[in-house]
Amino acid sequence: MITEYKEVLGNSKFVYLWMSQLFSQLTINVTNFLFLLKLFSLTGSTIATSLLWISYALPVILVGPLAAATVDMFDRRSMLMLTNFLQALSIFLYALLKNPSIFLVYGLAMTYSFLNQFYVPAEAASLPSVVPKKNLPQANSIFFLTQQGSLAIGFAIAGLLNHFLGFSTSLFIGAGFLFLAFVSVSFLPRLKPLEELPKNFEEGLGDFFSRLVEGYRLIKSNRMVLSPLILLLGLQVCLAVIAVNVPKIVQDVLGLSANVGMAFIAFSAGLGAGTGAILLSKLIKVGWRKKRMIDNFLLSLGIFMLLFIFTSGGFLGPLNIFVSFLTIFFMGLSFIGVIIPAQTFLQEKIPGGFRGRVFGNYWFLATIITIFPVLFAGTIAELFGIKLMFMLIGAIVVLVSFFSRRWGQNYLEEGAFNGL
């Protein structure tokens, strides 16, 4: 196994593409949380931070399908270079401004997201061109781990960068990372399109929607696919809702400064997630079924979310931070304990020819689904407080766990192959 990864990492073309992904992912996650901190410091409003998510989401919905269809129309190296350069330029120019309007933050988020709709599919389409087919599983694993790791690292260091270097300097660093991504992909060979422009565009756009429809039909007709997918989408909604409200959680629940609090949450949850991944492998070895893991960790997640709120009043005195660390740690552990078995179960139950149709459009569907919950949660937190919002999410998670334990197995068995 180690030899296989060494072979991939010894491929210079892959390394150039991977470095571009690493710098790009770090930048988008760091700037995301920098913008959250900036908006919250200026407005103190969870609605304002929720609108940042909407600014990122709109280009995904409006441009995503079109951008995905254009990937094979142009030289993919040129597309990667162009998007990286324009993203770096947009962040650099914004960082030069003195006291810009908060509306420009939303404009920059939309611009970055718009360009990202072209970068991400071009990156994914380039991977098979620079890596031999036999090494694709290892290459995809490295890309997935980089994506998840960049999210955790970006969340952790955004507050520290903002605290020690300031907002503008942190953005200059982000622009520098994107320029390094631009330089890295410039070393790739030209990846020219194979067919003419109009034909590729029509086929690409048609293929995107046909795959979406085919995936929808499979999902609707097979509860073994529908159930874990709904669970994963629900967890994605919860994660998005919590992420945009992190500054409010840090201020009102933990009583810490936003910069320090974000690093505290990232460290606690990240440590829990890492521990959870190790624990899962041990549970699998002793014979735990995926359904059992999902039910138990889902209940654990809901309970620790409620404990996080009920133990945050400050009445624990010096122990308050330690108890908060423990509850966040176990939330991270429980979250991974649900995500990994649910995703594995879904991968096993989707017929091989349909996996691309379901997973290829997962983030597109997740973005659409999260828009209204994010806005609704921001409004709830604004009007009634962040603790009520967190309590509602925790209660819903506990209820879902209860229904899954009570009726989940029968539901799956009765409709496993309905319509197939």
Report the location of each language-model feature.
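Flexible cytoplasmic inter-helical loops of multi-pass small-molecule transporters
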Residues: 187-214, 415-420
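Short loop-to-helix capping motifs
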Residues: 11-12, 45, 101, 166, ...
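Hydrophobic alpha-helical transmembrane segments
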Residues: 102-107, 113, 138-198, 267, ...
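C-terminal transmembrane bundle of multi-pass solute transporters/carriers
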Residues: 52, 62-66, 73, 77-79, ...
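Substrate-agnostic recognition of the 12-TM MFS/MFS-like secondary transporter fold
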Residues: 15-32, 55-69, 75-88, 104-163, ...
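Membrane-helix boundary and inter-helical linker elements of multi-pass secondary transporters
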Residues: 10, 41-42, 72-73, 98, ...
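Helix-loop boundary and gating motifs at the non-cytosolic
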Residues: 2-58, 217, 221-269
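Structural signal for membrane-spanning alpha-helices in multi-pass inner-membrane proteins
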Residues: 36, 91-98, 158, 162, ...
